[in-house]
């Protein structure tokens, strides 16, 4: 795919943003190592792998959109700077949505760490103090 895109003058790269949760994909150094171990590397993919929101997930752009829940999503800079996005993905189980596919992969995969935090903010527990016994 990368070679085909290059034949049209494109500069293809594989990308992802760091995760909100701790682990090997929460920083770009270990994220790249994990990607390489899973076969996503310049040799097998014939293009570079770039962690779009930088080393610690703080490299992003706020993109104004007309969204009710997220009016200015924080998008990894490398993704925001891309001329075109070609999404190649698979389905996978997700505990809240049932399945994750193209929309989930683009929505969460393009969001920086801060963007993911904002997207998950609505799932925070809420306390009804009227029903609380103060335990």
Task: Give, region by region, the residue ranges found by the protein language model.
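N-terminal and secondary-structure boundary signal
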Residues: 1-135
């Amino acid at each position: 795919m990368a070679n085909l895109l290059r034949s049209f003058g494109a500069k293809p790269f594989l990308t992802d943003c760091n995760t909100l949760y701790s682990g090997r994909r929460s920083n770009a150094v270990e994220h790249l190592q994990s990607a390489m171990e899973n076969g996503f590397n310049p040799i097998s993919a014939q293009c570079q792998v770039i962690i779009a929101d930088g080393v610690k997930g703080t490299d992003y752009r706020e993109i104004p959109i007309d969204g009710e829940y997220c009016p200015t999503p924080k998008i990894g800079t490398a993704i925001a700077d891309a001329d075109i996005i070609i999404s190649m993905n698979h389905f996978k189980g997700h505990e809240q949505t049932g399945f994750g596919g193209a929309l989930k992969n683009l929505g969460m995969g393009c969001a920086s760490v801060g963007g993911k935090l904002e997207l998950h903010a609505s799932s925070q527990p809420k306390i009804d103090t009227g029903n609380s016994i103060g335990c």
